[in-house]
A protein has these predicted regions:
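Flexible loop/hinge segments that line or gate small-molecule binding clefts
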Residues: 157-161
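Conserved C-terminal portion of the radical SAM core fold
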Residues: 91-101, 122-127, 147-156, 176-231
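Conserved alpha-helical substructure of the radical SAM core
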Residues: 2-152, 163-167, 175, 179, ...
Length: 231
């Protein structure tokens, strides 16, 4: 079948959206599989290792009464290892397969560093989304695998104590996250890590003007080191 895309090649290559999103799906036939309803191995696989979360965000739909059993936690590494091992490693973009994220916080899994390092050792460019609350220096000493990430994105929920608390219901959230990010920016240059650091910020209804304050927050964090939040 033909999907009817007739864009000029040079124009496509100059557009990041086409380069990073549409072209890969066209090249590996994923769009045709989707239209025809036939099976294809996923281009992206989300890994959700979080066991709990320190925040109680107003927009989150998780069940606060649900808990994992200790046996589930103990075998979590083997479960994610199996998913990684079963990857066929086919196609031009297989290395960019995995995203660690979730409705719960990934850093609450005691094997998170091990999961990341294993994926990295198998040739995958591991990426993770986190709220950054647990990203302390003591945590990093125990979870050195964090530094094997290709990319880490921090989800921001405000720009000061009040705005952070309004969303997360955690009074310490803003101060702890900002401190952790500053310490992380100072720590990375002392290692051999190639990690890239970025942020996400959810624009809640009526808060689009807050983006300026978020930029100021990022500017403050970036002032402490040559290693910076870069996207």
């Amino acid at each position: 079948m033909r999907l009817g895309y007739k864009h000029e090649k040079d124009k496509i290559e100059s557009n990041r959206y086409w380069n990073n999103t549409i072209l890969p799906l066209l090249k590996n036939g994923s769009l045709e599989h989707a239209v025809e309803g036939t099976y294809a191995y996923p281009n992206r696989i989300g890994l959700y290792p979080g066991m709990t979360c320190q925040f109680f965000c107003t927009f989150c739909g998780r069940n606060y009464n649900a808990k994992y059993n200790s046996t589930d936690i103990a075998k979590s590494f083997e479960v994610f290892k199996q998913v990684i091992d079963q990857d066929p490693k086919e196609g031009e973009f297989w290395q960019d397969r995995f995203r660690i994220s979730g409705g719960l916080e990934p850093l609450t899994n005691p094997y998170i560093g091990k999961i990341i390092s294993y994926g990295n050792s198998q040739g995958f460019k591991m990426q993770m989304y986190t709220n950054g609350y647990a990203l302390s220096q003591n945590f990093l000493k125990k979870q050195q695998g964090i530094l094997d990430l290709e990319v880490m994105r921090i989800s921001l929920y405000g720009y000061d104590q009040e705005s952070y608390y309004r969303v997360t219901k955690n009074k310490k959230s803003f101060d702890i996250v900002v401190k952790n990010l500053k310490d992380f920016c100072k720590y990375v240059p002392t290692t051999k890590s190639k990690i890239k650091l970025g942020v996400n910020w959810i624009i809640l209804p009526g808060h689009s003007e807050d983006v300026r304050s978020v930029f100021e927050m990022i500017k403050d964090i970036n002032s402490v080191s040559d290693f910076k939040i870069s996207f």
